[in-house]
Amino acid sequence: MRVFFKTYGCQMNLNDTETMAGILSQHGYEVVNLPEEADIVILNTCVVRQKSQEKYHSALGQFVKLKKSGKIKLIGIAGCGSNLEGEELIKSGADFVIGSRSIGKIAEVLQKAARGEKIVYLEDDICTVDSKTPRMRFSKHHAWITIIHGCNRFCTYCIVPYTRGREKSRPLPDVLLEVEKLAKNGVKEITFLGQNVDAYGKDLKDGTNLASLIEQAGKFEQIKRIWFLTSYPTDITDKLIETVAEDPKAAKSFHIPVQSGSNRILRLMNRRYDRDQFLQLVEKIRSKIPHASISSDIIVGFPTETEYDYMQTMDLVRKARFERLNLAVYSPRQGTVASKYFKDDVPREEKVQRLNKLLELQKQINRELNMQYLGKVVEIIVEGKTKEGLYYGRDIRNKVIIFSSQEVSEGENVLLKIDKITAGPLYGKLQKKCGL
């Protein structure tokens, strides 16, 4: 039977889809790229925002219609939506629901669904997913590697601890076995993933940590670049900063969500730091790694956010000068502390206005930061082509650079001279191909 996956949300969901696709492929299923080619559709869902939840519900409705017309046979739901909604998704037309920590059992669940059973399987079987688990990688040169599942932080706005569970790290030897396997298969870039990736190893209580993992993963000659995300500010250690600074294979890039620049709002969010501590962390990273790229996330319109709170956020963005900034308006998530106890009292129009002002500020900062690239030669790893047929890739600071060429290969290292900047990607001219 043929299976189509539609994936929503974060990189961990992408990695989970790769895992489920690999397991099903090993069990004789054919993974296809188009839903019209499939007998089975699996939606790997995200509920971090209301909009993402609405998207997969809309898709579920469309696929239910296709099933009634006989064009598909089964519909499955995976990801965070499974843990949040469970049986309700069966009532909405799904044939099976599998939890985010249950994906190692996807073949067994699908077999039961194929026999006509309506299945909701939400058990914590995440230990069954390890270096031996087959994965269908969607990139030839880059691989996602989930090293820690779940989150213990319980920020008041966030649904993740309720849908992904508590933190559970993979043993370091098992992660390194996966890295070794990838290196042998020609992968040259890896990204270590976790909702709170810097907490990696704490629960193992054997000294394992992210810094030591990066150091050991870099010993594989084929691996040329190592990324990690997402970071929680107070879990970034001096040792991690030193490792990123000194290890030539470690990408000089940190993604550190700040969420607000107001100390009052940070306390309401249960973020365990204040604005000064965050800015001191940014300064520390840049003092050790002068050209480090630091990106962040911000939520605008959190309950009770005043104009003063918002201006504090604007001020923090001016001082931090992020390379990139992911912005979102606050939306209550079912089951979180904020949805239970805080009234969503900032008008939608005000939220959007605040977001747009922050977006304009960040664009201005981006243009200013990007000016330093003009005329410089940088090395990137080619990732693919744009819709316009141009090639693109990233440098070691996570800067996207677009260029034209007669022919280069995905995963190839090339040197580019930057001749055009924007508030987003840079543009360059090919100077030299450095090979695969």
Swiss-Prot record:
One of its GO terms (molecular function) is N6-isopentenyladenosine methylthiotransferase activity. It is found in: Cytoplasm. [4Fe-4S] cluster 2 binds at C151, C155, C158. Residues 371-432 form the TRAM domain. Its EC number is 2.8.4.3. Residues 1-115 form the MTTase N-terminal domain. It catalyses: N(6)-dimethylallyladenosine(37) in tRNA + (sulfur carrier)-SH + AH2 + 2 S-adenosyl-L-methionine = 2-methylsulfanyl-N(6)-dimethylallyladenosine(37) in tRNA + (sulfur carrier)-H + 5'-deoxyadenosine + L-methionine + A + S-adenosyl-L-homocysteine + 2 H(+). Belongs to the methylthiotransferase family. MiaB subfamily. This is tRNA-2-methylthio-N(6)-dimethylallyladenosine synthase. The lineage of its organism: Bacteria, Thermotogati, Thermotogota, Thermotogae, Thermotogales.
